[in-house]
Amino acid sequence: MIKIIVVLFSWFATANLWAFDNVKLSLDWVPQGEHGGFFQAIAKGYYAEHNIELEIIPGGPSVNTKAMLMADQVEFNIGGSAGALNYAKQNLPFTAVAAFFQKTPQVLMSHPNVGIDHPSDFKGKTIFLSNFGRLSFWGFIKNKYDLSDDQLESYNFNSQPFIDDPQSIQQGYLSSEPFAIKKAAGFEPVVHLLADHGFSAYANTIEASDKLIAENPDLIIRFLTASRQGWEDYLNNDPQPAFDLIQQLNPDMPSDKLVYAHSKMIEYNIVTGNGEKIGSMSADRWKEFYEMSVELGIYDSKFDHEKAYTLEFSN
């Protein structure tokens, strides 16, 4: 496995290498533009400034990064609201300590210029969803816009059925399927970002063990501080340093897709939401998502959802 190591050049830092913490961060997918802030923090030396030597562990379809967290093989894992609630539901000792995406990049897409410009226009239309989509956000969209399960068709990560049917809708990820469809079919789909329609899940959360939270809160503070610096730099300055490191770990990632992802995160305020501090979370937001999940039957019984997160570090 390729390792990205923060290398120190100053004599002061070199003299204090013994004080550095070796930290592993596992990703929720293969390295991509949505992870750019963490890579920017490596490239710009922000982790090094906080005495952290960071190794990034790629995720992917055959990589169980949550198992790595549970086995104490990594200090931090990237997750989301649902995963943290599942920890709380099962009384597992893992907790979300920050959220670097105020908005989940999950989208539904429609064709342009066909009158499907808002989720309220979805009635009676074919909707291509994966099993994940059915289990995670479908109930929310269905209830809010009075849709029906009869509209659903399976989405198996092949967009051709959607491309062929101008009256259909398909799920996607903000920087992935819209980009691929534009390249394959020559049109930019209409993007309906679920977060902009009230779906309140956090994404790119940082998960840590309760043991680490109790025994080494200083490490968490330093890691999150450096990560915030990386995200601020990535969004506001030249992202190329992050792109270069992402492509070292994921050589199959095209440069134009990285540029597209970066621009869409800024356009849709994925990281900053409505002006929230980068990485921050709120108790009200967690409560809202939990209560919505219970109402939709995702959880068959109530539990202490506050165990899913801590605001000790994020705000």
Task: Name each region found by the language model.
Residues 1-11:
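Sec-dependent signal peptide recognition
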Residues 14-15:
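N-terminal signal peptide c-region/cleavage motif recognized by signal peptidases
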Residues 20-21, 313:
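Bacterial Sec-exported substrate-binding components of ABC uptake systems
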Residues 22-155, 159-164, 168-175, 200:
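Short, glycine-/small- and polar/acidic-enriched structural segments
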Residues 82-83, 157-252:
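Pocket-lining segment of extracytoplasmic ligand-binding domains
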Residues 215-298:
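Secondary-structure end/capping motifs
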Residues 289-291, 295-315:
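Hinge/cleft segment of the Venus flytrap/periplasmic-binding protein
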